Structures are given as C-alpha cells and as structure tokens.
Amino acid sequence: MLIPRRVKHRKQHHPGRSGQATGGTKVSFGEYGIQALTPAYVTNRQIESARIAMTRHIKRGGKVWINIYPDRPLTKKPAETRMGSGKGSPEWWIANVKPGRVLFELSGVNEEVAREALRLAIHKLPLKARIVRREGGE
C-alpha cells in the first residue's frame, strides 16, 4: 500500500478538483496507459487494487508503472459524534487526479493483453478513463 513515510502536517485541507492536469499527461515510460477523463480522489487502496488487477492479467510478462502517489490525508470523524470539537483523524491517503493525467503505464506485452489489463484496472478506479498509446515511433 502506498503511504508517505512522514508528512509535515498530519491534517490538510481538501485539494481542489477543478481544472485540467498540467503535467503527466503523456505516456512516458511504457507503451500503453490509462488517462483520466474526469476529476477524482483516488485512494491508496484503489491504486493497489488496480495494480493487482493488471499484474494478475499480464502474468509474468510486462512492466507496470504507477504515475500517481497518494500524498494527501483525508480525515473523518467517528460515527455518531457531535459536530464541532476539531477536525477528525486521518482515515485515508488520496491522490488528487485531474482530467488528462496518465495514472498507470504498461509495456512488454502485446496490444490485446495490454488493453484488457488496463480495462480491468479502469473498473477499479472511481473515475472515467480511457486507454492511450505512446506517441512517436519508438
């Protein structure tokens, strides 16, 4: 599971979800990738679940890159607690994903296997996404 080793502040404000991604919008490591079409908070559990779905489908071949990291804590107050008395305790770690961001990349397998593996991973994520291919003749 992806969790930061240490953070400067234990509790943070919720990150904004508006706007387009400015960096990480192209497939740079692998041959195929998953590109977000809608904004979302992706938790560390969802990232891990998508990674497992991909690696199980491609079996031993291929390599997977994870291009997002859950570096923001999301807090929650306990159930049946009255309002007030401060902010809740950190419950999850999230990555703030904006439209256009490439989340995962994959290489080393044929196109049919790669598309199916990425399709399985998209179903584990809380956003709409598409499968993109690397640009250029490499």
From Swiss-Prot:
Residues 1-25 are annotated as: Disordered. Keywords: Ribonucleoprotein, Ribosomal protein, RNA-binding, rRNA-binding, tRNA-binding. HAMAP family: Ribosomal_uL16. Residues 1-16 have a biased composition (Basic residues). The gene is rplP. It comes from the Bacteria. The keyword Transport does not apply. CDD domains: Ribosomal_L16_L10e (cd01433). The lineage of its organism: Bacteria, Bacillati, Actinomycetota, Actinomycetes, Micrococcales. This is Large ribosomal subunit protein uL16. GO terms for molecular function: rRNA binding; structural constituent of ribosome; tRNA binding. Binds 23S rRNA and is also seen to make contacts with the A and possibly P site tRNAs.
